Amino acid sequence: MRISIFGLGYVGAVCAGCLSARGHEVIGVDVSSTKIDLINQGKSPIVEPGLEALLQQGRQTGRLSGTTDFKKAVLDSDVSFICVGTPSKKNGDLDLGYIETVCREIGFAIREKSERHTVVVRSTVLPGTVNNVVIPLIEDCSGKKAGVDFGVGTNPEFLRESTAIKDYDFPPMTVIGELDKQTGDLLEEIYRELDAPIIRKTVEVAEMIKYTCNVWHAAKVTFANEIGNIAKAVGVDGREVMDVICQDHKLNLSRYYMRPGFAFGGSCLPKDVRALTYRASQLDVEHPMLGSLMRSNSNQVQKAFDLITSHDTRKVGLLGLSFKAGTDDLRESPLVELAEMLIGKGYELRIFDRNVEYARVHGANKEYIESKIPHVSSLLVSDLDEVVASSDVLVLGNGDELFVDLVNKTPSGKKLVDLVGFMPHTTTAQAEGICW
């Protein structure tokens, strides 16, 4: 395939070398004549192990060339990868100046092409950038319609400096954000030889995936550092601790807890977070990330409250009271906190939880329920249908399978607030998720 790559920094230069090595005809484009001269000499414009050999191979086979002529690069290629930098502004926002310049140049060139051209943003950009910046600029400069006259997609990269060639050849996944199916098919064809799952999503989802990956990596480093600092302060080798943590692929390094939704609770997590952060404070060990966990958790409860109270009704049915399905444990359940907030604001609340209802009559938690939360337990109703019938807003609080049917067949006139993730799709006119 004929590919033009705009921007020959770390991402663009690596892509140029790897794509040409896989048989594609690649044109590297940059405003820097120095970089272009290096590319045309088969030399690398950056320090990256193994890259220069690929660039030399590309030049020797005639599959790689460099130019400062933006227009010619577009006219002589079928697809353009935008790999320019998106540096930070002083306020932390992205500087899209390079993106905007390239989009204008590509747009003007597309205006003169009769055949379809595809534009793929590989630069890291915030969700909404392609739809709100890239597409309008190219459409305005080309006089053509995105998704119809020219293709548009995103293809976030997961390359690490110093291991970029290996990361390109053996990626964890290939993410394609497509405005139109033809663009997705084209990108899938380019990457079909790579041994990695190809994931096709909307443009906005692909944009968000890249940021989520990078922020998650930063969060992991910060978490490990704070744990290491506390561990050292109590006389423990933090490396030894984290080595064991990383051996658990069932819970610690898995998708189990990595699902957006409601706050955490129960008898362990809140208590242990408080205990560890209290000890860290006693030892004068700074722990800004760990110290923010409980505050963030409370914010999620407040978010649920705001979502529920945004509806113009006072009749609310809370489905689930324990912190998770399959238990009657109400200790530090965020749903109890949510119920208390609704009661405090005068909402007409009905609660259904079959496990808690049983415990209120028979279980070991009977005394806890009666002594600690009598104002909440008094609102428990044993009949799910009664709660549904008497409520205007139904809140799915935990993952009890009894509640699934309400998502599939929400009663007429009822509003649904999903804190669990039962909804197969995002927010609709009748149902809304806390994070979807």
From Swiss-Prot:
It is an enzyme of class 1 (oxidoreductase). The gene is algD. This is GDP-mannose 6-dehydrogenase. GO terms for molecular function: GDP-mannose 6-dehydrogenase activity; NAD binding. The lineage of its organism: Bacteria, Pseudomonadati, Pseudomonadota, Gammaproteobacteria, Pseudomonadales. It comes from Pseudomonas aeruginosa (strain ATCC 15692 / DSM 22644 / CIP 104116 / JCM 14847 / LMG 12228 / 1C / PRS 101 / PAO1). Pfam families: UDPG_MGDP_dh, UDPG_MGDP_dh_C, UDPG_MGDP_dh_N. PANTHER family: GDP-MANNOSE 6-DEHYDROGENASE, UDP-GLUCOSE 6-DEHYDROGENASE TUAD. Catalyzes the oxidation of guanosine diphospho-D-mannose (GDP-D-mannose) to GDP-D-mannuronic acid, a precursor for alginate polymerization. The alginate layer causes a mucoid phenotype and provides a protective barrier against host immune defenses and antibiotics. Other sugars are not used as substrates. The active site is at residue 268. NAD(+) binds at residues 10-11, 30, 35, 86, 124, 271, 331. It comes from the Bacteria. GO terms for biological process: alginic acid biosynthetic process; cellular response to cell envelope stress; response to osmotic stress; single-species biofilm formation. Induction: Highly expressed in mucoid but not non-mucoid cells, probably activated by algR. NCBIfam families: NDP-sugDHase. Belongs to the UDP-glucose/GDP-mannose dehydrogenase family. The N-terminus (about 270 residues) binds NAD(+) and GDP-alpha-D-mannose and is joined to C-terminal domain by an exposed linker.
